[in-house]
Amino acid sequence: MKFAVLVFPGSNCDRDMYNAAIKSGAQADYVDYRETSLDGYDGVLIPGGFSFGDYLRSGAMASVAPIINEVKRLANDGKPVLGVCNGFQILTEIGLLPGALLHNDSHLFISRNENLKIANNQTPFTNLYGENEIVVYPVAHGEGHYYCTDDIYNELVENNQIILTYEDNPNGSHENIAGIVNKAGNVCGMMPHPERALEKILGTDSGVKLFEAMVNSWREQNV
């Protein structure tokens, strides 16, 4: 399996994403936002950071980058797409995931480890975790409040699209939502950082299973 790790001006988690892909047994390349083809890639990783300085709003300017049409194409083809933090914001901006990310209720930047519950372990991103397993991922964001209308929330619940919830909501996210998938289950966005949770020496290795799950799920379908 070969991942494209997207790089925008202001990305700062691209190396972490690359490392996570390699550690999970996949191949990976950094792909500049000005590229117009993702031919040859089996999945996309959209990292955190502050793409284009978060001007206008988080993810807004990245949403019109040349590479985005290819991200949409791969997503529509059923290939896995993971967006973390700013990557999640970008996925909502381009319409691959519902809802929006607002400023934290505290209006402060939050950076700490958070306990999270695996709310759905039947996706290509979470199928190596136990049902309702508690994991620890770092968060680092100022605009991590997940917002959606009641109709969208009811749809997320009905379709089992909520995959990750906060045990102690740090930002005011609707119903403690930390991560979701699209209806097809191949596009995932989350504010916490699994790519920063790969080594026990750093405090948690809870993120390892997420990337291994992506690779294993792809191999089951393609090898």
Swiss-Prot record:
> What positions does the domain Glutamine amidotransferase type-1 occupy?
3-223
Q: Which SUPFAM superfamilies match?
A: Class I glutamine amidotransferase-like
Q: Name one GO molecular function term.
A: glutaminase activity
Subcellular location(s): the record lists:
Cytoplasm
SMART domains in the cross-refs:
GATase_5
Q: Which residues form the active site?
A: 85, 193, 195
The subunit field of the Swiss-Prot or TrEMBL record says: Part of the FGAM synthase complex composed of 1 PurL, 1 PurQ and 2 PurS subunits.
Q: Which PROSITE patterns match?
A: GATASE_TYPE_1
**What's the domain of life for this entry?**
Bacteria
Q: Which UniProt keywords apply?
A: ATP-binding, Cytoplasm, Glutamine amidotransferase, Hydrolase, Ligase, Nucleotide-binding, Purine biosynthesis
Function summary: Part of the phosphoribosylformylglycinamidine synthase complex involved in the purines biosynthetic pathway. Catalyzes the ATP-dependent conversion of formylglycinamide ribonucleotide (FGAR) and glutamine to yield formylglycinamidine ribonucleotide (FGAM) and glutamate. The FGAM synthase complex is composed of three subunits. PurQ produces an ammonia molecule by converting glutamine to glutamate. PurL transfers the ammonia molecule to FGAR to form FGAM in an ATP-dependent manner.
> One GO BP annotation here?
'de novo' IMP biosynthetic process
Source taxonomy: Bacteria, Bacillati, Bacillota, Bacilli, Bacillales
- What's the gene? purQ
Reactions that this protein is recorded to catalyse: N(2)-formyl-N(1)-(5-phospho-beta-D-ribosyl)glycinamide + L-glutamine + ATP + H2O = 2-formamido-N(1)-(5-O-phospho-beta-D-ribosyl)acetamidine + L-glutamate + ADP + phosphate + H(+); L-glutamine + H2O = L-glutamate + NH4(+)
The EC number(s) given in the record are 6.3.5.3, 3.5.1.2
* Disulphide-bridged cysteine pairs: none
Which named protein is this?
Answer: Phosphoribosylformylglycinamidine synthase subunit PurQ
Q: In which pathway does it act?
A: Purine metabolism; IMP biosynthesis via de novo pathway; 5-amino-1-(5-phospho-D-ribosyl)imidazole from N(2)-formyl-N(1)-(5-phospho-D-ribosyl)glycinamide: step 1/2
Q: Which organism is it from?
A: Staphylococcus haemolyticus (strain JCSC1435)
Chief place of localization: cytoplasm
- Provide GO CC annotations from the record: cytoplasm
* Classification via NCBIfam families: FGAM_synth_I (TIGR01737), PRK03619.1 (NF002957)
